[in-house]
Curated annotation (Swiss-Prot):
Family: Belongs to the enolase family.
Protein name: Enolase
List of residues binding Mg(2+): D245, E288, D315
Lineage per the UniProt record: Archaea, Methanobacteriati, Methanobacteriota, Thermococci, Thermococcales
InterPro entries from the UniProt entry: Enolase, Enolase-like_C_sf, Enolase-like_N, Enolase_C, Enolase_CS, Enolase_N
Keywords: Cytoplasm, Glycolysis, Lyase, Magnesium, Metal-binding, Secreted
Superkingdom field: Archaea
Functional note: Catalyzes the reversible conversion of 2-phosphoglycerate (2-PG) into phosphoenolpyruvate (PEP). It is essential for the degradation of carbohydrates via glycolysis.
Example of a GO biological process term: glycolytic process
Residue positions binding (2R)-2-phosphoglycerate: Q164, K340, R369, S370, K391
GO CC, alphabetical: cell surface; extracellular region; phosphopyruvate hydratase complex
Length: 430
């Protein structure tokens, strides 16, 4: 008898991401359904990330992904035909086997991830289940707090701000719908506040939809955010808190061993003092990548000093890699994981990293990349994991709002059951 869940087709293609760069999209077909997934790419990438395969040469300035697409169509597809689409772990294991390298450099992490996610979506579709329910079961019901990147600096913007992201977190809202309304209202007030202070040319948006005003000192965006939150009618800290992504690896001078912030040099201890000052002055509840990706000692220090009141997030530190995460847990470095599926390469590995973090009492933030697509898989993943947090940009640009809109739909589907993480975003024990 024919298995309706048998994979009968796998097709990859080259499409464009939100920055106009090529990326990989894959369709997976069964007898009764199909799944489509497109992969993102990052601008500030960790050294230990899985390798995104690019073509080189003149085409698309070397950023083409025809090799990755060909690897799906010629190497992966023939192996997947006939397999049961519900065998996610077996399929992910096969993808790793076909590549054969630790950093997925043969077939390409972009090829592998697109297939892995498309398989999960095809399975959910074939079973007539929403993706979050297929991945998380009946216990997937926590809607995440958005960490919305409304002011951009670093490599995401063309200004002199050294810290990469200044985010708002609507922790005091009662539902996701209310939370995203608060974010949207604050974002529009912020635009007005920035225009008044810096002029109409200061509200250009960065890769993630946030504004990139001509600021230099790290306190400037924090002051402007407090003003915008208050003018929007909310209480800073109690209703809307602040979060930072420092992306410190970009600020580290290998020769001097020091960090450069606002034109000044800081050693590890001095930078820690800066963070202590900022967290005592502003309602900052989360700091991502406060130190260089190999500065384990710096992460241990800040976690000891501030971890009781501030979430210390490892992004470039962990790169969603279970080995690096386990090392961090042993050392007491950071207390939260930034989960980016394309840093590790398969859905199974990403979910394993999340479970490792949860078991250690670490928080998990499901995250986008700066180069995104209209694919909203991470919205479903955040709910499937009951992660309690999602980082997917400002409430602007369709590639960012696709995720927020999907979360609005999921909350509607889960009416009467859905719980918004709110102030318990770090430890979601409902």
């Amino acid at each position: 008898m024919e298995n309706p869940y048998e994979i009968v087709g796998v097709v990859a293609r080259e499409i464009l991401d939100s920055r106009g760069n090529p990326t990989v999209e894959v369709d997976v077909y069964t007898h009764v359904g199909m799944g489509r997934a497109a992969v993102p790419s990052g601008a500030s990438t960790g050294t230990h990330e899985a390798l995104e395969l690019r073509d080189g040469g003149k085409r698309y300035h070397g950023k083409g992904v025809r090799r990755a697409v060909e690897n799906v169509n010629k190497i992966i597809a023939p192996e997947l035909i006939g397999m049961d689409v519900r065998w996610q772990r077996e399929i992910d294991a096969l993808l790793l086997e076909l590549d054969g390298t630790e950093n997925k450099s043969n077939v390409g992490a972009n090829a592998i991830l697109a297939v892995s996610l498309a398989v999960a979506k095809a399975a959910a579709n074939s079973l007539e289940l929403p993706l979050y329910q297929y991945l998380g079961g009946v216990n997937a019901y926590v809607l995440p707090v958005p960490l919305s990147n409304v002011i951009n600096g670093g490599v995401h913007a063309g200004n002199d701000l050294d810290f990469q992201e200044f985010m708002i977190m609507p922790i005091g809202a009662d539902s996701f719908r209310e939370a995203i309304r608060w974010v949207s209202e604050t974002y529009h007030v912020l635009k007005k506040v920035i225009m008044e202070k810096y002029g109409k040319n200061a509200v250009n948006v960065g890769d993630e939809g946030g504004f990139a005003p001509p600021m230099k000192e790290v306190t400037e965006p924090l002051d402007v955010l407090i003003k915008a939150i208050e003018e929007a009618g909310y209480k800073p800290g109690d209703e809307i808190a602040l979060a930072l992504d420092v992306a410190s690896s970009e600020l580290f001078n290998e020769e001097t061993g020091k960090y450069v912030v606002g034109g000044k040099e800081y050693d590890r201890g001095e930078l820690l003092e800066l963070y202590k000052d900022l967290t005592s002055t502003y309602p900052i509840v989360s700091i991502e990548d406060p130190f260089h990706e190999e500065d384990w000692e710096g992460f241990v220090m800040i976690t000891k000093e501030l971890g009781h009141k501030v979430q210390i997030v490892g992004d470039d530190l962990f790169v969603t890699n279970p080995k690096r995460l386990r090392k961090g847990i042993e050392l007491g470095a950071a207390n939260a994981l930034l989960l980016k599926v394309n840093q590790i390469g398969t859905l199974s590995e990403a979910m394993d990293a999340a479970f490792t973090a949860f078991r250690a009492g670490y928080g998990v933030i499901v995250s986008h990349r700066s180069g995104e697509t209209e694919d909203a898989t991470i919205a479903d993943l955040a709910v499937a994991l009951n992660a309690g947090q999602i980082k997917t940009g400002a409430p602007a640009r369709s590639d960012r709002n696709a995720k927020y809109n999907q979360l609005i739909r999921i909350e509607e589907e889960l009416e009467g059951v859905a719980v918004y993480a709110g102030k318990r975003f770090r430890k979601v024990f409902f």
